[in-house]
């Protein structure tokens, strides 16, 4: 297996403790019979293409990528990212399958999803669990793993990915009325790093280490990107609104969680009586 690399800005960095095999490598693929069959017949891709016609998925050889992944543990993780950050990437759908029969709470390695302006959701990497999401639409990361973690991922391309409406932010999108649209549009990627500025920073440190050369370079690149966007006063004002909405959403969610805990405690007291 090869060391995994992450694209951040214009450079690529090696992630500690993460290794992978790209099944486009025929010699390696032929050593994994079942994965070779999966890659050659692409039945799952064809089935998804039938079930999701609106995505106009492709099922030809060059449009499908399958990677096997081994996380050694020792804190191995992924920083916040989209699987499709923009042109010329064609990825449309991500399908992750987890292969961890003995996973338990505390082992780490959860997939953490960040639906735009909503509360994050943690997905446990349990054996045979399949997670499917839009490559160009869902911000996510992998939390630090403290035990070996195995999975494979299928990415499927589409020729309609990254249209002009998906990549070009306009003045009409910088208003409250545009928020419902942004929640369901890949255009949210343009604003992602400024809205989730702190989350990006923490995820980089978690992945690359606090004072490593790679983390310093990635943090500097991230900061430069954020500042370049915030130089536009209209963007800066709208981002402040989005951050407030995100904070309020999380505060409301935390209050509901606390309320649920109080109800459970009250129920326990009644049971004890």
Predicted regions and their residues:
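Catalytic core of non-heme Fe(II) oxygenases with the double-stranded beta-helix
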Residues: 34-170, 269-273
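Transcription-regulatory cofactor-interaction regions
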Residues: 184-192, 196
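Non-heme Fe(II)/2-oxoglutarate
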Residues: 1-52, 169-172, 177, 181, ...
